[in-house]
Amino acid sequence: RSVDQVLKALRVAGGGRPWHGIAHAFNGSEQQAQACIDLGLKLGFGGALTFERALRLRRLAADLPLSAIVMETDSPDIPPHWLYTTQAERSEGQAQGRNEPSELPRIAQVVAGLRGMPLQALAQASTDNALQALPRLASLLAASDGGLHGT
């Protein structure tokens, strides 16, 4: 329901103009995804879709237009399945793995596998999409480190 409320507010506030931005840690329906895309937003996917039971998210990541997808870690929150420990495991002393930006390539590999495409092509598309969604990002990156590294 919160996605629908945000979409309604964006439609009202936008007055018909497209938005630039990313629906962070998107976990909505196919209809909500399309509504975000129609408003000009990109959809952020991260660790949540690495769980095999996340069927809807995995289907969206596989089927949505590549131009709508941005990869994200949401570190330290929303760890991928390989870092997650259950409440029972934690009560027995097993530590929760720490989600860090270094997990992004492995998360992206899951999405690339779902889409049946090379990891590098997904990484480039995600970078391009992030730069479209956040137009000032390119100039900020250039000012901070001389360009995009690792894309």
Placement of each model-derived feature along the sequence:
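Residues at secondary-structure transition points
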Residues: 1, 27, 52-55, 91, ...
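Catalytic pocket-lining loop regions of alpha/beta-barrel enzymes
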Residues: 1-71, 79-82, 132, 142-150
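A short, structure-level motif marking secondary-structure boundaries and short turns
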Residues: 16-18, 92-94, 137
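Residue-level "edge-of-site" marker
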Residues: 49, 74, 125
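Alpha-helix boundary/capping detector
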Residues: 62-63, 86-87, 137-138
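Short acidic/histidine-rich active-site segments
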Residues: 67-97, 122
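Mid-to-C-terminal alpha-helical segments outside catalytic/metal-binding sites
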Residues: 98-151
